[in-house]
Amino acid sequence: MEFKVDTHTHTYASGHAYSTLIENAKSAKENGLTMFCSTDHAESMPGAPHYWFFSNQKILPRFLEGVAIVRGVESNILNIEGEIDIPPSVDRNLDWVIASFHEPVFPPANKEAHTEALINVIKSGRVDALGHLGNPNFDFDFEQVLKCAKEHNVAIEINNTTLKGNSRVGSVDRCHEIAQIGKALDVYFTTGSDAHFCHDVGNLELVSELMDNLDIDSNKVITHSAKQFLSFLELRGRLPIAEYDEIRNA
């Protein structure tokens, strides 16, 4: 499957990534993307920036190197109540919010606690996607969470870095199972490189292989085209981004 959007990328602002936004944009262009989301870690993650960094993305151009730039964040799930570490006042300046578990922020607990946290995150209405769910340290009830995501139009991320097998060890088989259940439940999928260096932006080869093997419908993969991605944002209740009208109407 082909993807024109990468919804999970990091710059050096995340504290443990190594490229600038311009470098990421250049790589995105070289790798054939139409659009990518810049999603640095929110402030609870060690080394991550203050929330002002995310609020101030309003000053960013909508295109760099001819590639559309989506203003986003990878927020941290803080607790079983489903709170994330971005103040609600910042929401209006963001186009795309991922919520993820990270061990330094949410110490792994048990399946029930993780399930409750994910469901509450979804029901909060503040997040557009759940990130790298395959991590075995954060086991959860796949079917229960994915049903909730389907009901609330929250996308399920398939993460290329996870599928390499050397990060979040033990995730690969779980990612396949999550994708199979998601297909059966007709959820929306998104695809993220989780690039922490510019050369990885748009590297979604393993995600493509997984989706082809499972025969996932490209109409349910919001990153298959930039137009599909923008339609999903509107489905989520976000206002159309005027600068992307040409993409939307293509």
UniProtKB/Swiss-Prot annotation:
GO cellular component: cytosol
Cofactor notes: Binds 3 Zn(2+) ions per subunit.
Record bears the keyword tRNA processing: no
Cited InterPro entries: Phosphatase_YcdX_put (IPR023710), PHP_phosphatase (IPR050243), Pol/His_phosphatase_N (IPR003141), Pol/histidinol_Pase-like (IPR016195)
GO BP terms: bacterial-type flagellum-dependent swarming motility
Positions contributing to Zn(2+) 1 binding: H8, H10, E74, D194
Domain of life: Bacteria
Binding-site positions, Zn(2+) 3: E74, H102, H132
EC number: 3.1.3.-
GO molecular function: phosphatase activity; zinc ion binding
Annotated residues for binding of Zn(2+) 2: H16, H41, H196
NCBIfam families referenced in this protein's UniProt entry, alphabetically: PRK09248.1
Record-stated family: Belongs to the PHP family.
UniProt cross-references to HAMAP family, sorted A to Z: YcdX_phosphat
Identification of the protein by name: Probable phosphatase VPA1527
